[in-house]
UniProtKB/Swiss-Prot annotation:
GO molecular function, one term: molecular carrier activity
Protein name as catalogued: StAR-related lipid transfer protein 7, mitochondrial
Protein species of origin: Homo sapiens
One Pfam short name: START
Region Disordered, residue ranges: 111-138, 343-370
Keyword DNA damage: no
Domain START: 112-327
Cellular compartment(s): Mitochondrion
A GO cellular component annotation in the UniProt record: mitochondrion
InterPro entries documented for this protein: START-like_dom_sf, START_lipid-bd_dom, START_lipid_transfer, START_STARD7
Function: May play a protective role in mucosal tissues by preventing exaggerated allergic responses.
Length: 370
């Protein structure tokens, strides 16, 4: 048995929180030891394997640990400095969801036109997750700008002071291919967009064609410049005569947050383009859905004004850059021709089954790249 004096001292320490302090110290020691071991393992593998080998190794480890409590896979990826594509790549379902939104808007517009009402896109009824009120009803879209070839709506994002925006527009003097390529070409954008401070591709995914970009842009004075790290993927559907580009914010170990800029961590953008005739003839409609959190202390109406006025300005600059590239024959990368146009139905099945085998392919009449 313990001596009475020692037992009394131990009990007194317990009442005063001594036992809790002892347990806390033990937890800190064990946690620190495991973190140091993990860092040592990461350094060892960094010396033994190349970056591509580490990426494959971490991908296998992520699949093994996926679903376990504590998200051990994300911790391992962060320690090894590897971006886990299995979690972050843009999936086919995200592209298809955007295409379905465009089709739904077109169907509603056709209904209005057939009933004798003057042709114009009706109020959109999106199915976007995360925009429902406390009763489970979808937030309604509010018209902000109504012009002949440019219509802008907005709706509140539940639980925030922010809005989601939607644009339906038309251009008749450039081709869909030209507009699409100018939007994707990062090198050309550095020339026509004066707000760009930095824009570069960080990493590409050979499986889906997604790629991660780092974009730094000026914001109106007196705000600091913002930087975005986001993943994007596009698809060109020849059979349904549509193009789609989807982007959203991610975290990447190669681009840590900088004190020079304000990191925008919430950002989503989906654009769908419907040619009036073909990809190489003038004329198309487009549907752009956009939301982000610029991390500003300005009131809601100020942020809303900046976005609702900045979006038409950006789209017009994009349009003018496309016209300039067309008229002056400026060389712009042709993303639509970046991959073969046609594949057999047998090849399509092989492509779908090989996505998990890290073999990038595309379906029939569909070209996918970032």
């Amino acid at each position: 048995m313990l001596p009475r004096r020692l037992l009394a001292a131990w009990l007194a320490g317990t009442r005063g929180g001594g036992l809790l302090a002892l347990l806390a110290n033990q937890c800190r020691f064990v946690t620190g030891l495991r973190v140091r071991r993990a860092q040592q393992i990461a350094q060892l593998y960094g010396r033994l394997y190349s970056e591509s080998s580490r990426r494959v190794l971490l991908g296998r480890l992520w699949r093994r640990l996926h679903g376990r409590p504590g998200h051990a896979s994300a911790l391992m990826a962060a320690l090894a400095g590897v971006f886990v594509w299995d979690e972050e790549r843009i999936q086919e379902e995200e592209l298809q969801r955007s295409i379905n939104e465009m089709k739904r808007l077109e169907e509603m517009s056709n209904m209005f036109q057939s009933s004798g009402v003057q042709h114009h896109p009706p109020e959109p009824k999106a199915q976007t997750e995360g925009n429902e009120d406390s009763e489970g009803k979808e937030q309604r879209w509010e018209m902000v700008m109504d012009k002949k070839h440019f219509k802008l709506w907005r709706r509140p994002i539940t639980g925030t002071h922010l809005y989601q925006y939607r644009v339906f527009g038309t251009y008749t003097d450039v081709t869909p291919r030209q507009f699409f390529n100018v939007q994707l070409d990062t090198e050309y954008r550095k020339k026509w967009d004066a707000l760009v401070i930095k824009l570069e591709v960080i990493e590409r995914d050979v499986v889906s064609g997604s790629e991660v970009l780092h974009w730094v842009t000026h914001f109106p004075y007196p705000m600091y410049s913002r930087d975005y790290v986001y993943v994007r993927r596009y698809s060109v559907d020849q059979e349904n005569n549509m193009m789609v580009l989807v982007s959203r914010a991610v975290e990447h170990p190669s681009v840590p947050e900088s004190p020079e800029f304000v990191r925008v961590r919430s950002y989503e953008s989906q654009m769908v383009i419907r040619p009036h005739k073909s990809f190489d003839e003038n004329g198309f409609d487009y549907l752009l859905t956009y939301s982000d959190n610029p991390q500003t202390v300005f009131p809601r109406y100020c942020v809303s004004w900046m976005v609702s006025s900045g979006m038409p300005d950006f789209l017009e600059k994009l349009h003018m850059a496309t016209l300039k590239a067309k008229n002056m024959e400026i060389k712009v990368k042709d993303y639509i021709s970046a991959k073969p146009l046609e594949m057999s139905s047998e090849a399509k099945a092989t492509s779908q089954s090989s996505e998990r085998k890290n073999e990038g392919s595309c379906g029939p009449a569909r070209i996918e790249y970032a």
